[in-house]
Amino acid sequence: DFVTVGDFAFYDHVLNHSLRFGVVPARFGTEQSADNVDLSFRLARGRAPTGNDAPACEMTKWFDTNYHYLVPELIPHQTFSLSDRRLFAEVKEAQALGYPIKVVLIGPLTYLWQGKCYGGDFEKLSLLEGLLPVYAQIFNELMALGVTWVQVDEPILALDLPPTWQAAFERAYHRLQRRDLNLLLTTYFAGLEDN
C-alpha cells in the first residue's frame, strides 16, 4: 500500500524527465525555474507567458498508445545533470502526509530509446554512460529522504531489442543497484520474449 510519487506531469512524464536531466534544446535557453511550467509549455507549444518563442519539440505516440509525448532531443556528447528537483519536493509532500511512498521513473534505456538524435549521426546508446550517474544521484537522494522503493519503467523490454541494448540492461542495472533501495523494474504492453 504505497502512494506513487513521480507520476504527475503538467504536460507529460517524458518531458518531466527531460527537464530533470537537463535535456533542453539550446533554442529554449538554459535557464530553468523552480517549477519549469512556462519552460514546459514553450517546449510543448513553442510559446508561454514568459521566455522567447521557439519551434516546439516533436510530439509522437508513446509506443502504440494514443498517449503522445515530447520526444527528447539528444545531441552528440549530450550532457546530463540533475536540473529539476520537483520530484524531491513531491516526495517530501507525500511523506509529510504520512504516506508510505514508491517513486516511479522512466528507466534510462527507455528514455534514450524514445529520444531522437539531432546534430549528427550517432548511437543513442552511447549516451547511457553519461545518463547513469544522474540516475545514481536521484537514487542516492531518494534514499537520503528515506525512500525504500523505486519503480523503474522500462517498456522497451517488450520490444525486439538489438543485442547491444539487451546487454546494456545488465550493465546499467548492475551500476544502479543500491543495498537499501528496492528497485521494481516494470514493463508493459507485452511480455519480455527474448529480453
PLM feature spans:
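Domain-level signal for soluble alpha/beta catalytic cores
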Residues: 1-195
